[in-house]
């Protein structure tokens, strides 16, 4: 005959919380049933039984509720198992003394202290969660601001170069006006992005459509002509005439190509060469490769250069590149569902590769873009 009294418990926790060390230890201990009680454990997820939160006035999870023997007690916080272990001997003692006709209740001081501990732990947990949410939001907004600020450099540089070219007689005034007008339109779009940084996810600022990457790369090469001609750098392109269109944001793709080609020029030796290749890799992807014959990137740096605020190795001109550009490229490519990587050897040069989805009749309503 089993004389053990029932210890009825309810564990309220989300699925991901069940794998934490504290909760796993608690469940393992309860399953071993190595105590003076017959343990009955019910595990409930708050999304499936939200009424439990209101019924037991829970302000934070995970939480362990002792239903019986009375009185009801609630344990919450990050150390539920240790709290349970501290109280279990007391419940056992209470059961024994009741069998002997002795009424042994926790002291009023103990009860007040325990209640205050629970309240403080609940408040701390809520504050930690709020702090984590705010920190992530601030980091996201800072990242967006850095990216948009970096994008502003492109139209400003292009406008400056156009003014210089007009002064040298390389373009006429009507061509200059056309360039300035186009760049001001780009700056206006970027200004709108800045205004939406606090209220909009970066992914929502993308406008995917059917675009021709070959034409965009030709425009970028022409825009950077002054830089590569000045250093006698040769740019060779291998873009098939039947290359399919891609489904992407035209302005963002132009930014990726501009960043990567500009970096290739910066890191190339004078009289060097750069090759731009585009191939229809599979039915779903176009792969773009931009290779230079510069100093190369150390293996230890090849993954880090795509992170925020990472400086690139020194260029051939003795200046160091800043990693915001490559970080922006990574996020743009990833938002389109593609990937970006580098293959590089010291003294041999670097090849940057990235993939973009092929246009297959998609429209803006279709969720082809993913979070970066």
Swiss-Prot record:
Residues 147-360 form the Histidine kinase domain. One of its GO terms (biological process) is osmosensory signaling via phosphorelay pathway. InterPro entries: HATPase_C_sf, His_kinase_dom, HisK_dim/P_dom, HisK_dim/P_sf, KaiB_domain, Kinase_SasA, Light-responsive_reg, Sig_transdc_His_kin-like_C. Coiled coil: none annotated. The keyword Kinase applies. It catalyses: ATP + protein L-histidine = ADP + protein N-phospho-L-histidine. SUPFAM superfamilies: ATPase domain of HSP90 chaperone/DNA topoisomerase II/histidine kinase, Homodimeric domain of signal transducing histidine kinase, Thioredoxin-like. The modification Phosphohistidine is found at residue 150. GO terms for molecular function: ATP binding; phosphorelay response regulator activity; phosphorelay sensor kinase activity; protein kinase activator activity. Its EC number is 2.7.13.3. Keywords: ATP-binding, Biological rhythms, Kinase, Nucleotide-binding, Phosphoprotein, Transferase, Two-component regulatory system. NCBIfam families: PRK09303.1 (NF006800). Member of the two-component regulatory system SasA/RpaA involved in genome-wide circadian gene expression. One of several clock output pathways. Participates in the Kai clock protein complex, the main circadian regulator in cyanobacteria, via its interaction with KaiC. KaiC enhances the autophosphorylation activity of SasA, which then transfers its phosphate group to RpaA to activate it. In addition to its output function, recruits fold-shifted KaiB (KaiB(fs)) to KaiC to cooperatively form the KaiB(6):KaiC(6) complex (independent of SasA kinase activity). The N-terminus interacts with KaiC, while the C-terminal histidine kinase domain autophosphorylates and is probably responsible for self-oligomerization. The N-terminal domain stimulates the C-terminus to autophosphorylate. Homooligomerizes. Interacts with KaiC. Participates in the KaiBC complex, whose core is composed of a KaiC homohexamer and 6 KaiB. This is Adaptive-response sensory kinase SasA. The lineage of its organism: Bacteria, Bacillati, Cyanobacteriota, Cyanophyceae, Synechococcales.
């Amino acid at each position: 005959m089993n004389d053990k009294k029932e210890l009825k418990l309810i564990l309220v926790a989300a699925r991901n919380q069940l794998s934490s060390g504290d909760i796993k230890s608690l469940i393992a201990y309860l399953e071993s049933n190595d105590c003076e009680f017959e343990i009955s454990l019910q595990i409930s997820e708050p999304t499936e039984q939200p009424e439990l939160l209101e019924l037991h006035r829970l302000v934070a999870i995970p939480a362990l509720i002792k239903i019986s023997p009375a009185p009801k007690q609630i344990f919450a916080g990050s150390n539920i198992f240790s709290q349970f272990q501290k109280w279990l001997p007391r419940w056992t003692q209470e059961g024994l003394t009741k069998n002997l006709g002795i009424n042994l209740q926790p002291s009023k001081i103990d009860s007040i202290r325990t209640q205050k501990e629970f309240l403080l732990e609940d408040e701390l947990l809520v504050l930690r969660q709020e702090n984590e949410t705010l920190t992530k939001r601030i980091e996201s907004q800072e990242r967006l601001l850095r990216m948009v600020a970096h994008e502003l450099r492109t139209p400003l540089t292009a406008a400056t170069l156009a003014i210089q070219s007009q002064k040298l007689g390389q373009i006429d005034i009507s061509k200059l006006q056309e360039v300035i007008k186009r760049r001001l339109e780009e700056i206006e779009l970027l200004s709108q992005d800045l205004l939406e940084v606090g209220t909009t996810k970066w992914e929502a600022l993308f406008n995917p459509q059917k675009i021709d990457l070959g034409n965009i790369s030709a425009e970028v090469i022409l825009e950077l002509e002054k830089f590569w001609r000045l250093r006698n750098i040769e740019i060779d392109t291998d873009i098939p005439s039947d290359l399919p269109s891609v489904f992407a944001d035209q302005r963002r793709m132009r930014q990726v190509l501009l960043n990567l080609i500009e970096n290739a020029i910066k890191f190339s030796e004078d009289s060097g060469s750069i090759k731009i290749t585009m191939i229809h890799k599979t039915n779903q992807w176009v792969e773009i490769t931009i290779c230079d014959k510069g100093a190369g990137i150390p293996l230890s740096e090849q993954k880090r250069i795509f992170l925020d605020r990472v400086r690139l190795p020194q260029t051939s001109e003795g200046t160091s590149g800043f990693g915001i550009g490559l970080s922006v490229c990574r996020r743009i490519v990833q938002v389109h569902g593609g990937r970006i990587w580098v293959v590089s050897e010291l003294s041999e040069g670097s090849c940057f590769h990235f993939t973009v989805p092929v246009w297959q009749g998609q429209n803006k309503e279709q969720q082809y873009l993913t979070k970066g």
